[in-house]
C-alpha cells in the first residue's frame, strides 16, 4: 500500500553532497548521535547538530540528542552505552577516527546491537598521512562483525543509507555504511531524495520492540559483559551464525522495497553490461560510475564485457554473488581501493577467489585510487585489455606509473565523453573564492533548470 502511494508522488530533486545525503537520511532513524569530527566526515556531524538545534524531528517525533565527545573512542563508547540503554544511536567518522573505534566495534557486534556508522572512507596514515579517500580504514574493520554496506554516488548514498538503519534493527546486526571520502562525500549532485515518510514506514516495529526489550533496566536486570572461559566462549561465539546467515536476505528485501519506492534498482550485487559477457570487472564505491561508462563504450564496439558493483560486502553472500554473474563469464578482474601489505591479494579479491573456488573462471586482482588517485575510463579499458592478454598481470595497479615493481598497466588514449555533456575545469588560488563560486553555480543550475549538474572540488 505504501509503495503504491509513493509511486504516485512527485519526485523531490535537491542539490547536496554525499555527506548531507547520508546525514539527512540517517536523522529520522537516530535518537542519540555521539560525534567527534574528522575530515572528510565532519559535515555529517555538523549537519546533524544544526538540525537538532533547529528542532527537526526524527521518526519518533523527537529531536536527536547530540553529544560531542573528547575523541572518536569516546564517541563510539557513548554509542555503545546508548544502545545498551535501548536507544537507536548513530555516529560518523573516517580514517584514524575509525581506527580508535575498532575495539568497541567488536563489542557492539558481539552483543548484536543495531548501531550504524556512516563513514566517509579515507586513507589511514602509513608512511605519511593523507586526508583523501580510499578503503583502507573500512577494510581494517572487516573482522569486527559489523555489516559493511557500500555506496558509490550521492544518489546511492541517499537511497541506501536508510537500508543500513532498517536492516540493523531487523537483522539485529550493526552496520557500517561507507562511501568514498571527498569523491562522494564532497561531490555536489542533483539527487532524487527518497520520500522520508515512505522510507521510515519500512522500519520493523516488532524488531524495534525486541531491541528495546533487551535494554538494561533495573526492573528486569540481566548479566552482561562477562569474562568467559573456554568451556562456553567458543560455542557462544558460533551461536551468532544464524543472524549473519540471514542478514543478506534481510538487506536484499529492504533494497527491493527501496527500489520500489525510488524506481532505481538495487541489489547486494548490481550487474551492468552485456548479458553474455565473458570479461567482468568487480569493484565497489565511486569507481562504479567510471566502470559503467567504460563498459557502455566497449559494448558499443561489440566487446562482451560487464561490471559487477558490490553493495553488501559483509556478510559476503556467495548465493547472491554467484547469481549476479553472467553464466558466460570466463575472466574476472577485481579492483581493490586499498593496499594489503604482505598479503597474496587485497580483501575483495580474496573474497571473490574464495567464492569462485572450484570454477574454471580466471580471477586476477589489482589496486586503484589510493589517496583519491583519479581513475578514468581509459584505465578501466586497460584492465579489460589486461584480462584478455596472453599473460595477464596479476596484482596490477592503475592510475600510476610503477617504475619500481613494474605492476602498472599501460593505458591507451580513450575518449567516452557524451557529446551532450558540458565539462568545465576551474583553477583558483586560496582565498580567491573559486570553490565558493562553483558551489553556488552548480546549485543555481540544478535548482533553476532541468539540467543535472555535478561538481567536485
Q: Which functions belong to the PLM regions below?
A:
Residues 2-140, 145, 162, 392-395, ...:
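Thiamine diphosphate
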Residues 60-64, 175-270:
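Conformationally flexible catalytic loops at phosphate/diphosphate-handling active centers
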Residues 275-303, 316-321:
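Redox- and metal-dependent alpha/beta enzyme cores, enriched for Fe-S-associated oxidoreductases
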Amino acid at each position: 500500500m505504501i509503495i503504491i502511494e509513493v509511486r504516485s508522488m512527485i519526485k523531490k530533486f535537491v542539490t547536496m553532497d554525499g555527506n548531507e545525503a547520508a546525514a539527512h537520511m540517517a536523522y529520522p532513524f537516530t535518537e542519540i548521535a555521539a560525534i567527534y569530527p574528522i575530515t572528510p566526515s565532519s559535515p555529517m556531524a555538523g549537519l546533524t547538530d544544526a538540525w537538532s538545534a533547529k528542532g527537526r524531528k526524527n521518526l519518533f517525533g523527537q529531536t536527536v540528542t547530540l553529544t560531542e565527545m573528547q575523541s572518536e573512542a569516546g564517541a563510539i563508547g557513548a554509542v555503545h552505552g546508548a544502545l545498551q540503554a535501548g536507544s537507536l544511536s548513530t555516529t560518523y567518522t573516517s580514517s584514524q577516527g575509525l581506527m580508535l573505534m575498532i575495539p568497541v566495534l567488536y563489542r557492539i557486534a558481539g552483543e548484536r546491537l543495531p548501531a550504524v556508522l556512516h563513514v566517509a572512507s579515507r586513507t589511514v596514515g602509513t608512511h605519511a598521512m593523507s586526508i583523501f579517500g580510499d578503503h583502507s580504514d573500512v577494510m581494517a574493520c572487516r573482522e569486527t562483525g559489523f555489516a559493511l554496506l557500500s555506496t558509490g554516488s550521492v544518489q546511492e548514498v541517499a537511497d541506501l543509507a536508510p537500508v543500513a538503519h532498517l536492516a540493523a534493527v531487523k537483522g539485529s546486526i550493526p552496520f557500517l555504511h561507507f562511501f568514498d571520502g571527498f569523491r562522494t562525500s564532497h561531490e555536489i549532485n542533483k539527487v532524487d531524495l527518497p520520500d522520508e515518510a515512505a522510507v521510515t514506514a519500512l522500519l520493523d516495529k516488532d524488531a524495534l520492540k525486541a531491541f528495546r526489550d533487551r535494554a538494561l533496566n533495573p526492573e528486569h536486570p540481566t548479566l552482561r559483559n562477562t569474562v568467559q572461559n573456554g568451556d562456553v566462549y567458543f560455542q557462544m561465539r558460533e551461536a551468532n551464525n544464524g543472524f549473519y546467515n540471514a542478514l543478506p536476505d534481510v538487506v536484499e528485501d529492504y533494497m527491493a522495497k527501496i527500489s520500489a519506492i525510488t524506481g532505481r534498482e538495487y541489489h547486494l550485487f548490481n550487474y551492468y553490461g552485456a548479458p553474455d559477457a565473458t570479461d567482468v570487472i568487480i569493484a565497489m564505491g565511486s569507481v562504479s560510475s567510471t566502470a559503467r561508462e567504460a563498459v557502455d563504450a566497449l559494448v558499443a564496439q561489440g566487446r562482451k564485457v560487464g561490471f559487477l558493483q558490490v553493495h553488501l560486502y559483509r556478510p559476503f553472500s556467495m548465493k547472491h554473488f554467484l547469481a549476479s554473474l553472467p553464466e558466460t563469464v570466463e575472466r574476472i578482474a577485481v579492483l581493490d581501493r586499498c593496499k594489503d601489505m604482505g598479503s597474496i591479494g587485497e580483501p575483495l579479491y580474496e573474497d571473490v577467489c574464495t567464492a569462485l573456488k572450484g570454477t574454471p573462471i580466471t580471477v586476477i586482482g589489482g589496486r586503484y585510487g589510493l589517496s583519491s588517485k583519479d581513475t578514468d575510463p581509459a584505465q578501466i579499458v586497460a584492465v579489460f585489455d589486461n584480462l584478455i592478454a596472453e599473460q595477464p598481470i596479476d596484482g596490477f595497479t592503475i592510475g600510476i606509473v610503477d617504475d619500481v615493481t613494474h605492476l602498472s598497466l599501460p593505458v591507451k588514449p580513450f575518449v567516452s565523453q557524451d557529446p551532450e555533456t558540458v565539462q568545465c575545469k576551474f583553477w583558483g588560488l586560496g582565498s580567491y573564492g573559486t570553490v565558493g563560486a562553483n558551489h553556488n553555480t552548480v546549485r543555481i543550475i540544478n535548482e533553476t533548470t532541468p539540467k543535472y549538474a555535478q561538481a567536485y572540488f
